[in-house]
Swiss-Prot record:
Domain of life per record: Eukaryota
Residue positions of motif DDXXD motif: 315-319
Keyword set includes Cell inner membrane: no
PANTHER family according to UniProt: (-)-GERMACRENE D SYNTHASE-LIKE ISOFORM X2, OS04G0344100 PROTEIN-RELATED
Annotated cofactor note: Binds 3 Mg(2+) or Mn(2+) ions per subunit.
Family that this chain belongs to: Belongs to the terpene synthase family. Tpsa subfamily.
Name of the protein: Probable sesquiterpene synthase
Pfam families in the record: Terpene_synth, Terpene_synth_C
Entry function: Sesquiterpene synthase.
Keyword Magnesium: yes
Cofactor or coenzyme needed: Mg(2+); Mn(2+)
Residues annotated to bind Mg(2+) 3: E467
Sorted UniProt keywords: Lyase, Magnesium, Manganese, Metal-binding
Length: 562
């Protein structure tokens, strides 16, 4: 990180200095400009026609889900296609009833079904029930292992079955060594055969090895699956058409939403006021779409994206610009949460602090209208705690202090921002986000710690080199290396093991019976998925390269051809 001299006019209370040395990170600018500010509304007649088609097709699909009730395998395949095409949210009740029926008859009553001796069918059955939070045992795969516990050799040629088993293994919980073995077995075999397969199976295998379904963003996975599903001659034409129409309607809805937010963001002029900070509104909105894309969560998205942009700027003030004295002032102002604190801040900090108060006041009015004013207490407290964590890291950086790994993680889990983002994600979710739900969240349950761990460990793993080059606070990799006297690669291996553990914790916490309503758990799962996607190979939020550009284009630029 470069130390650059900045004019004293940008700060206050330091009149005895002419220039201040600042640790500027030189983040790349936004690549989008004003692209998403203007939104051309679709012709109302065309829109109405598409909506009518969607309603008609929904009835067709609804009937098909009901018709297959006594054919579990056929029903599982329709449910799988519905979910992978991104339209399961349209049929939540029907899918829940179908899976409940299948669970009771094939698992509780142990009734055999067509395909119950076939690896693909059993793995699909297991994955869909686990994916929908049913506690089914992995012992169902014992029939595919020999007396020594190894998977049978005759499975080696069943690529379709191996692929389905591979996807199922990512839903494992602690104590399921069989699924750990299955993951290693299927991954090794699929990697060895992928270059010899034909389309579309080759593409399915290649994609799954890169992005397992369970850890992917449902809407992004749907974009990929459209062409795979269409390539199968036996695909359900009504289902595919419905999925494409719904995708395009939702994309228009999201583009309008982003256009409104982009105009608000431009009116703040943060790009000019905070040129040292990351200008990542579009990337932030993509992040939020990963948390919830459904139309009923429009208010929730508008709330979280505004807060998201604020906290991204605050992060960079602490991380890449502010002096320790200035950051102390800002931290104290955040604890007071009072517009009167503006006068005590350096000039450049004032627009950010004022905007935070304004955004929270706007949210408070909405919460008051809903009779949910109690939520603001949690929203403010989690912000204060996050800023305190940023301050701790700033002190470490200033003192060139390398904490123990345990000390580092006690702060770094907070500054991962995932308890913060989960709290904010609940604000616009309606009555389901009760006081009891917020109290549960603030008790720091295992699923939250696991989500924070994924966020922190993946961030540290992907951004370690860049952060160290710019003189950032010691990363988890660096802390672990120093404390345990290991190499960087050994530290990375340990992080990979911890990521596996964290995902198992998340999978376990999402199984029935739920501690809080499922939609609230889904926010945590989806936030964790976002990290897996954006930080797959690098910090795609800070350094927006081809993968991130393509993902954003898929959801917010390119429509489906119906």
């Amino acid at each position: 990180m470069e130390n650059q001299k900045m004019p004293i006019s940008s700060v206050s209370n330091l009149k005895d200095l002419n220039m201040i040395s600042r640790p500027v990170a030189n983040f790349p600018p936004s690549i989008w400009g004003d692209r998403f500010i203007n939104y051309a509304c679709e012709d109302e007649n065309d829109q109405a026609q598409k909506e009518k088609q969607v309603e008609e097709l929904k009835e067709l699909v609804r009937r098909e889900l009901a018709i297959t009730v006594d054919k579990p395998l056929q029903q599982l395949n329709i449910i799988d296609a519905t979910q992978r095409l991104g339209i399961a949210y349209l049929f939540e009740n029907e899918i829940e009833e179908s899976l409940e029926h299948i669970y009771l008859h094939t698992y509780v009553e142990n009734t055999c079904f067509e395909g119950s001796d076939d690896l693909y069918s059993v793995a699909l059955w297991f994955r869909l029930l686990r994916q929908n939070d049913y506690r089914v045992s992995c012992d169902v795969f014992n029939k595919f292992r020999d007396n020594e516990g190894n998977f049978k050799n005759n499975l080696m040629e069943d690529t379709k079955g191996l692929l389905e088993l591979y996807e199922a293994t990512h839903l494992s919980v602690h104590g399921e060594e069989m699924l750990d073995d299955a993951l290693e077995f299927t991954k090794t075999r699929l990697e060895s055969v992928v270059s010899h397969l034909n389309y579309p199976l080759a593409e399915q295998v290649r994609h799954a090895l890169y992005q397992p379904l369970h850890k992917g963003l449902p809407r992004l996975e749907a974009v990929y699956f459209f062409r795979i599903y269409e390539a199968h001659a036996s695909h359900n034409k009504a289902l595919l058409k419905l999925a494409k129409l719904d995708f395009n309607l939702l994309q228009s809805f999201h583009k309008k939403e982003l256009s409104d937010i982009a105009r608000w963001w431009k009116s703040l002029d943060f790009a000019a006021k905070f040129p040292f900070a990351r200008d990542r509104l579009v990337e932030g909105y993509f992040w939020v779409l990963g948390v919830y894309f459904e139309p009923q969560y429009s208010l929730a998205r508008k709330i979280i994206i505004k807060v998201f942009t604020m906290i991204s700027t605050i992060d960079d003030i602490y991380d890449a610009y502010g002096t320790l004295d200035e950051l102390e002032l800002f931290t104290k102002a955040m604890q007071r949460w009072d517009v009167g604190s503006l006068d005590q801040l350096p000039e450049y900090m004032k627009p950010c602090y004022k905007s935070i108060l304004d955004v929270y006041n706007e949210i408070e009015v909405e919460m008051d209208n809903q009779g949910s004013l109690f939520r603001m207490h949690y929203a403010k407290e989690v912000m204060k705690k996050l800023v305190e964590g940023y301050m701790d890291e700033a002190k470490w950086c200033h003192e060139k202090y390398v904490p123990t790994f345990q000390e580092y993680m006690s702060v770094a889990l907070v500054t991962s921002g995932y308890t913060f983002l989960t709290t904010i994600s609940y604000l616009g979710m309606g009555e389901i986000a009760s006081k009891e739900a917020f109290d549960w969240l603030f008790s720091h349950p295992p699923v939250i710690e696991a989500s924070e761990s994924v966020g922190r460990l993946m961030d540290d793993t992907r951004s370690h080199k860049f952060e160290q080059e710019r003189g950032h606070v010691a990363s988890g990799i660096e802390c672990y290396m120093k404390q345990y006297g290991v190499t960087e690669e050994e530290a990375r291996d340990e992080f990979r093991k911890r990521l596996v553990k964290a995902w198992k914790d998340i999978n376990e916490e999402c199984l029935r019976p739920y501690r809080v309503p499922k939609p609230l758990l889904m926010r945590i799962l989806n936030l964790t998925r976002v990290i897996d996607v954006i930080y797959k190979n690098e910090d795609g939020y800070t350094h927006v390269k081809k993968a991130m550009k393509d993902n954003i284009a898929s959801l917010l630029i390119d429509p489906m051809i119906v």
